[in-house]
Amino acid sequence: MRPPGFWHAPPDALGWRARALAPLGALYAAATARRVARPPAHRPGIPVICVGNINAGGTGKTPTVIALQMILAARGIAAHVVSRGYGGRLEGPVAVDPRRHDAAEVGDEPLLLAAFGPTWVARDRAAGARAAEGAGAQAILLDDGFQNPTLAKDLSLVVVDAQRGFGNGRVIPAGPLREPVARGLARADLLLTIGPPAAQARFDALWGPATVTLPHLRGALTPLQTGMRWEGLRAVAFAGIGHPQKFFDTLQDQGVILCATHPLDDHQPLDARLITRLLADAKAQGAQLVTTEKDAVRLPAELRGQVLSLPVRLALADDTALTAALDTLFPNATRRL
C-alpha cells in the first residue's frame, strides 16, 4: 500500500487530514516513547551498529547496511547483520543462506544482504545477536532496529531520503514518522541523508541546522558499473520498493528509454503470473524487463534469468564523521586500502 500524499506535504503547510489525525499520532508517539525507554534486554560483548530511520518505509537503509558491511570488511572486522526479516515466515534465529532460502522464508532484504556477509534473521533481536556472537561475529549491524530496545546500541545511524525528508513532520497516521523528529535525533549518533544535490538542498531548506544538530553525513545511490550498457536500452521497469520513482529516475539518468513503468507495493510478492504478464508487456514493446536489485531476489527462480536488475551502491560525499565513529568503536582495527 502506497503512503498517502498528505504525509509528504511541507511541514508548514499541513492539510486537514494531518490535523484531524494528530491526536492518533500523539498516541502512536507516546507508545514509541514508552517502548524505546525500556532498558535493553541484552548487551552483546561486541559493538552494535544500528541502521534505522525515523520515517516509516524506504529511506535507503539496505544500501547503507551494504556499505557498512564493505567498510567493516575492509577494516578486517567480521560484521554480522541481524535483521527482523520483514516479509519472511521464519522466526529464527537462522543464518541466511541464499542457496537454500528464498524471500518468502527470510525476507528480501536479508537475502540481498547475505550476498555481502553473514546475515541472521531473528524476530528476537537479542537471540539473533547471541547467535551471531556464537558464530564468531566481531560486530553486529542491526538492520532497522532504531525503535527496538532489545539490544544495547553503540552507534545509531538514522537514514533519511533527502528529497522527502521527514515529510510533514507528523507521526503515523498523521504523517510518515515513527516518532517526533527531535526525539528521534536526540537518540541518534549520526544522520545520513541520501539523494542528489538538489534533494540535499531541499532537505537543508526544510530541516536545516535548527533541527539537525548531530553529525550529518550526505550520500547518493549510484549505479554499480557492471559492464552493462544501459544507454539506449528500451525497458519496461517495475519496482516494489519504498519509492519506486527513484528507481525509474535512475534508469532514465543512465539513458534507458522507459516504455512503461510499474510501481508496486513495497515488498510485494512477485509471483510467476505477475512476472509473466510483465515479460509479455515488455516483449510486445520490444523492450527488456528491468527491476531493482532488491526486487530481483523475490523473482521466481524459473524467470529470474529473463529480468535485468540495476544494482546501486551508496557513495558518501564525506565520510569523516563515520570514520571517526568507527575508529572509536574499533581502535585496534587495521584499515585495508
Curated annotation (Swiss-Prot):
GO terms for biological process: lipid A biosynthetic process; lipopolysaccharide core region biosynthetic process. GO terms for molecular function: ATP binding; tetraacyldisaccharide 4'-kinase activity. InterPro entries: LpxK (IPR003758), P-loop_NTPase (IPR027417). It holds the Pfam family LpxK. Pathway: Glycolipid biosynthesis; lipid IV(A) biosynthesis; lipid IV(A) from (3R)-3-hydroxytetradecanoyl-[acyl-carrier-protein] and UDP-N-acetyl-alpha-D-glucosamine: step 6/6. Transmembrane segments: none annotated. ATP binds at residues 55-62. GO terms for cellular component: plasma membrane. Its EC number is 2.7.1.130. It catalyses: a lipid A disaccharide + ATP = a lipid IVA + ADP + H(+). Keywords: ATP-binding, Kinase, Lipid A biosynthesis, Lipid biosynthesis, Lipid metabolism, Nucleotide-binding, Transferase. Transfers the gamma-phosphate of ATP to the 4'-position of a tetraacyldisaccharide 1-phosphate intermediate (termed DS-1-P) to form tetraacyldisaccharide 1,4'-bis-phosphate (lipid IVA). Belongs to the LpxK family. This is Tetraacyldisaccharide 4'-kinase. The lineage of its organism: Bacteria, Pseudomonadati, Pseudomonadota, Alphaproteobacteria, Rhodobacterales. The gene is lpxK.
